[in-house]
Regions:
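C-terminal non-catalytic regions of proteins with extracellular/luminal or membrane-system context
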Residues: 8-12, 16-200
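Conserved, charged catalytic cores of large soluble enzymes
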Residues: 1-7
Length: 200
């Protein structure tokens, strides 16, 4: 039926199961000085940086694409928990979730996004970086393998720049494959979330 609403097979039970699987599947890889869970009394200004904080990771990738009634982004979830303590900076741009091509992002755009993120980070008490892989071509997508182990779109440089500010940094990544972590010694915590579905 071409007129069927996408996600019409979903139920609250599906979303409950998705949330439980997500909670149990997240992996804590580093947690220096018990930075996590966040002590909300300690941090008045929490900056979230990274495109994956707002990007729908249920879209794209070929056959791994999900058809859901709604997604809850990490940023929406954090705002629900911490309210107006949360600020956001995109930090980088990856383009659309295409199956067989990559959008060309001008260097000036990436430079400006990184600059804006670093400016906001200087005013924050703690930084939550939400990035990693996505469902774009040459990422976690059919019809094209990744070309190297580095995080794309200048993410390693952005994370290194955030860590250089000497503030607590939590790196939260999404993705289904391994990646290089040249900044690991300079961040306080690393959490890997895989792909969590509609209840990210």
């Amino acid at each position: 039926n071409p007129n069927r609403i996408i996600g019409n097979q979903c139920s609250e039970a599906h979303y409950d199961a998705c949330r439980q699987i997500a909670e149990e599947g997240i992996v804590l890889l580093k947690n220096t000085r018990n930075l996590l869970p966040l002590d909300t009394k300690k941090y008045g200004k929490i900056l979230v940086v990274g495109e994956n904080a707002t990007r729908s990771l249920t879209k794209g990738g070929g056959s791994s694409e999900l058809k859901t009634l709604y997604d809850i982004s990490p940023l929406e979830g954090l705002k629900a928990l911490y309210g107006d303590k949360i600020d956001y900076a995109q930090g980088y741009e990856s383009g659309g979730a295409h199956y067989d091509k990559i959008d060309t992002i001008p260097v000036a755009v990436q430079t400006q996004l990184r600059k804006e993120a670093l400016e906001k980070a200087r005013k924050a008490d703690i930084i939550l970086y939400i990035g990693g892989l996505n469902k774009n071509h040459l990422q976690d997508c059919e019809n094209g393998d990744r070309e190297d182990y580095n995080l794309s779109f200048g993410q390693n440089e952005l994370i290194a720049g955030l860590a250089a500010l000497k503030k607590p940094v939590v790196v939260i990544t999404f993705g289904g494959n391994p990646y290089a972590t040249p900044w690991i010694d300079n961040v306080g915590a690393l959490v890997h979330c895989w792909y969590l579905g509609s209840e990210s």
